[in-house]
């Protein structure tokens, strides 16, 4: 067995953990916090030109005020379809059509809804932690295979410590992101 077979690809492990963090940030971005953000519209697709098209590909999305999102739809014939897609999306915002522009006034969240969103954020964070732990498990499995292929005990310990350090760092980043998101959600 060659020396390369006994190496553990820490970069691949790091990339997979970073992917879990990116997915978490995307999920957090879709949570409506009472503050305007273009990211709340990312999951919305519009039936345009015979296919489901992401809303951000049909017009420009701006946030001119803290509680207002403005969509300038490029094809004026799509305004009613965009409005319907927003209404049907379940994000809890009623679009207001103002000529060629669609305005989305973001209502304030009540305390009960804030707590509910905080729990949803915690659920997303737990999913990210599970994904990171699964990556850790895969890394540890690589180390076990390398050990059975002749890796020295000291090398096994070193690689295990490296994988654990990456895991601890990624879990800490998830916890920090969750804390920040919950603070943002609970802020009145």
Curated annotation (Swiss-Prot):
Q: Does the keyword Cytoplasm apply?
A: yes
Q: What is its main location?
A: cytoplasm
GO MF assignments: ribosomal large subunit binding
- Localisation: Cytoplasm
**HAMAP family named among the record's database cross-references:** RRF
Q: Which domain of life is it from?
A: Bacteria
Q: What Pfam family is a match, any one?
A: RRF
What is the species listed in this Swiss-Prot or TrEMBL entry? Answer: Cereibacter sphaeroides (strain ATCC 17029 / ATH 2.4.9)
Q: What are the protein's UniProt keywords?
A: Cytoplasm, Protein biosynthesis
Q: Which GO terms describe its biological process?
A: cytoplasmic translational termination
Q: Which family does it belong to?
A: Belongs to the RRF family.
Query: Which NCBIfam families does the protein's record reference?
Result: frr
Its function? Responsible for the release of ribosomes from messenger RNA at the termination of protein biosynthesis. May increase the efficiency of translation by recycling ribosomes from one round of translation to another.
Q: Which InterPro entries match?
A: Ribosome_recyc_fac, Ribosome_recyc_fac_dom, RRF_sf
Gene Ontology CC terms, in alphabetical order: cytosol
Q: What is this protein called?
A: Ribosome-recycling factor
The signal peptide stretch is: none
């Amino acid at each position: 067995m060659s020396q390369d077979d006994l190496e553990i690809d820490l970069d691949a492990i790091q990339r997979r953990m970073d992917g879990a963090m990116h997915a978490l940030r995307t999920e957090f971005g879709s949570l409506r916090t009472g503050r305007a953000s273009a990211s709340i519209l990312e999951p919305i697709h519009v039936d345009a030109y015979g296919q489901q098209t992401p809303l951000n590909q049909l017009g420009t999305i701006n946030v001119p005020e803290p509680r207002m999102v403005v969509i300038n739809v490029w094809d004026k014939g799509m305004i009613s379809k965009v409005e319907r897609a927003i209404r049907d999306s379940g994000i809890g915002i009623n679009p207001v059509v103002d000529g060629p522009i669609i305005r989305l006034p973001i209502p304030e969240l009540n305390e009960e809804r804030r707590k509910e969103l905080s729990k949803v954020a915690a659920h997303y964070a737990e999913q990210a932690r599970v994904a990171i732990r699964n990556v850790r498990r895969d890394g540890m499995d690589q180390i076990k295979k390398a050990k059975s292929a002749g890796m020295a005990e000291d090398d096994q310990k070193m690689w295990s410590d490296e994988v654990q350090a990456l895991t601890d760092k990624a879990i800490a980043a998830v916890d920090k992101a969750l804390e920040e998101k919950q603070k943002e959600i609970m802020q009145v």
